[in-house]
Amino acid sequence: IHIERGPYTLEWINKFVDRAVEMQIDEIRLLEHCYRFEEFVPMYDSVCAYSEYVDAWFHRQAGVRKLEEYLDLIKQVRNESFPVEIKFGLEICYFKEFEDFTAELTKNKGFDFLLGSIHFVDDFAFDHKAEHWTGMDIDKIYHRYFEDSVSLAKSNLFDGIGHPDAIKLFGHKPSYSLT
């Protein structure tokens, strides 16, 4: 569950806890997108250079917090008692060339889990707008998406993969079989 639509307060976290209790869920996993933290902003230089749209979107949304603020919230929550178990993590955009950078930023920070996600293929933001696919080589994008997915899994940086089928968001399909 992404928590980015509210403040880093116990009151905000309690809204998720209360809903979990209502639904008889005994564990919740809360996370943030890494791009929201200024420390991760350098990973996005090439995707911003690729597209004016992404550049504008990114600079409205990205780097609005410091990672330490999130880590402080995690410590604060862990010092309290809740009727459900709360785990904290990060969803990290996977870029092969930033594996070492990602490892350095996340090691020994106390996260319960890290999710790797692919939102960009060769800097193309495939899950932003359907019209951005116009004129794109769908077969090539799918091929590179799966190459990147394999690299993500082999990196051993992550505990899981976020939305592994995001590539099909707008209904585009390659000419070859995916089975």
Q: What are these model-predicted stretches?
A:
Residues 92, 96, 108-111, 115-179:
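Domain-core and long-helix interface of multi-subunit machines
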